[in-house]
From Swiss-Prot:
<dbReference type="Pfam" id="PF01488">
    <property type="entry name" value="Shikimate_DH"/>
</dbReference>
<dbReference type="InterPro" id="IPR036453">
    <property type="entry name" value="GluRdtase_dimer_dom_sf"/>
</dbReference>
<dbReference type="GO" id="GO:0008883">
    <property type="term" value="F:glutamyl-tRNA reductase activity"/>
</dbReference>
<dbReference type="GO" id="GO:0019353">
    <property type="term" value="P:protoporphyrinogen IX biosynthetic process from glutamate"/>
</dbReference>
<dbReference type="InterPro" id="IPR018214">
    <property type="entry name" value="GluRdtase_CS"/>
</dbReference>
<keyword id="KW-0627">Porphyrin biosynthesis</keyword>
<comment type="subunit">
    <text>Homodimer.</text>
</comment>
<feature type="binding site">
    <location>
        <position position="108"/>
    </location>
    <ligand>
        <name>substrate</name>
    </ligand>
</feature>
<feature type="active site" description="Nucleophile">
    <location>
        <position position="51"/>
    </location>
</feature>
<feature type="binding site">
    <location>
        <begin position="113"/>
        <end position="115"/>
    </location>
    <ligand>
        <name>substrate</name>
    </ligand>
</feature>
<feature type="binding site">
    <location>
        <begin position="188"/>
        <end position="193"/>
    </location>
    <ligand>
        <name>NADP(+)</name>
    </ligand>
</feature>
<comment type="pathway">
    <text>Porphyrin-containing compound metabolism; protoporphyrin-IX biosynthesis; 5-aminolevulinate from L-glutamyl-tRNA(Glu): step 1/2.</text>
</comment>
<protein>
    <recommendedName>
        <fullName>Glutamyl-tRNA reductase</fullName>
        <ecNumber>1.2.1.70</ecNumber>
    </recommendedName>
</protein>
<dbReference type="InterPro" id="IPR015896">
    <property type="entry name" value="4pyrrol_synth_GluRdtase_dimer"/>
</dbReference>
<dbReference type="Pfam" id="PF00745">
    <property type="entry name" value="GlutR_dimer"/>
</dbReference>
<dbReference type="InterPro" id="IPR000343">
    <property type="entry name" value="4pyrrol_synth_GluRdtase"/>
</dbReference>
<feature type="binding site">
    <location>
        <position position="119"/>
    </location>
    <ligand>
        <name>substrate</name>
    </ligand>
</feature>
Amino acid sequence: MDCDIFLVGLNHRTAGVDVRERFALANHCDEEHWALPCTGAVSESIILSTCNRVEILAAGTGEVAEQVLRNWAGARKSDVEDLRPYVYVHKNLEAVRHLFSVASSLDSMVLGEPQILGQLKTAYRKAVKSRATGVILNRLLHKAFSVAKRVRTETAVASSAVSISYAAVELAKRIFGDMRAHKAMLVGAGEMAELAAMHLLQAGIADILVANRTLVRGQELAKQFNGHAIPFEDMPRHLLDVDIIITSTGSQEPIIRARDIRAALKIRKNRPMFFIDIAVPRDIDPDVNGLDNVYLYDIDDLKEVVEENLATRRDEAAKAAEIVNEEVVQFSRWLASLDMQPTIVDLIKKGQRAAEEELAKTLKRLGPVDDNTREALEAMAGALVRKLNHDPIMFLKHGGMSQEGNGPRISIMRRIFNLDKTGCIYSEEN
């Protein structure tokens, strides 16, 4: 393979929510894509930016990881050295393994949750639309999707998985106990909000408000759960009516300020308010934490609820990891074939030319022969070429791809079989 695959990223393990929101790229994918493709070291790239991770998958030659870091930091108007301490870099097979694990939800905060696969598919569609992908990443992403499907089909890793939204509602139940007497508001109307609405209903809350920048989408979600949609700009004055607020927008700035909540608390006579901010960047001003009778949790605070649900799926995760490893090996063979294919083709052609030359000399010595004899000789020559080429081709194909690449093995094969010289294979003197 003439280029390498890199995965550069940070996630909920390497960076807190404050860092993740600082370097989030969710709103930068469409408009810029940082001009990564076809510039410098990078030839293909895909950006995955969610509440729990920002990862850039790139293919190219040379200083790919450094270029990705520079463009990433530049897109967020930050210094690359501020980003570097939180970042991991995977190369080639380790990048492939990590991507397969992410797609299969083995690297998620919520092991087995289904949202990440949809988010990855969306990221891929955006990259394709931006013409940022090519042969390598197209093949890799489609393989990742099939690996995720195989993991879900052959293991029970997702059978009892909780979503972030489920964890948020569970946390609310710990604060309020009986949820039936309380009202809730969802700020945002995406997949997270839809899941939250479902879990709120199951917990006993029948009165749900939905505030969304696009009122029509808010109305669609509210209709599904017999709720009420409100204009986004009216959201602050409705804070006094609700006890539980779950936010999940894509805003780059806080949309709920401490002053808004302070005003609501006065009218509510300090009745408790419970906020769960599952957006990255965060939707709620962190200063809200300083207010009495206000419980504010962000996405990192949900880990305890998630951990309680994890034990039952660890054995299944081990089975899923085995599937990932098998698929990495399979993909490595395809990768290896990319740079080995020219050598394999040259080897086959050289064998065919040698067979044709020797067959021509043999037929000349034999003189006129019937068609059956000619066909038998041609078949024998072809069979000999295939048998003689079998072991060298297997050596090339099944060596897999190492961190050092396949160059040394290809170079040896080309030297042994003298593939870089043209002309006749054998002369009369041979």
